[in-house]
Amino acid sequence: GKEITNDKAMKTLKGPLDSKVKIGVLRYGSDKIKEFTITRGNVVQHSVTSAFMINDTTGFIKIRNFGENTYPEFLSALAMLSTKNTENLVIDLRDNTGGLLQAVALMANEFLEKDQLIVYTQGRKAKREDIRADGRGAYKKIPLVVLINEISASASEIFAGAIQDNDRGIIIGRRSYGKGLVQRQLSFTDGSLLRLTVS
């Protein structure tokens, strides 16, 4: 075959829903290309990758990133664990590189009392904006542990920081990445985007 860039390969693979694309695979040790026809579809990446009981009283939720569906997925996981009489909760943010500020704020709100600070943003020329809990969270009393590591960054650090700063739970793990930034995403007509750090 001929060599193409990753960008060209991605553009070739993407297409209308339910349309077909033919790909060839050359396996290591073989000189024959094996062809496959693939039907294009929506690829859904879940933020909540697991939710289960560790023991009779402790629930566990692993969150890979903070995206548009994180909060509804998180609420579903909490509801499922609640049916199993969860008395304690472990939230695993290890290897979570962050995501949407709105998703992390909604999630933290579930555990904090009214007016407790979740996060504030402040730029060099922008005035400080506080995001506070509204007090309507359903899990304000459940004992909470948050797991982090050196890859936990951005929104993960905001969640862990809100829990720690409000003495709401215990943070366990390694020092996090250190990227407590807020970025705005600007989309351009050619499909490219720019992530601009604003605070």
Model-derived features: positions:
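Cleft-lining beta-strand/loop regions that shape enzyme active-site pockets
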Residues: 1-189
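Short, intrinsically disordered, charge-balanced linker/junction segments flanking boundaries
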Residues: 196-199
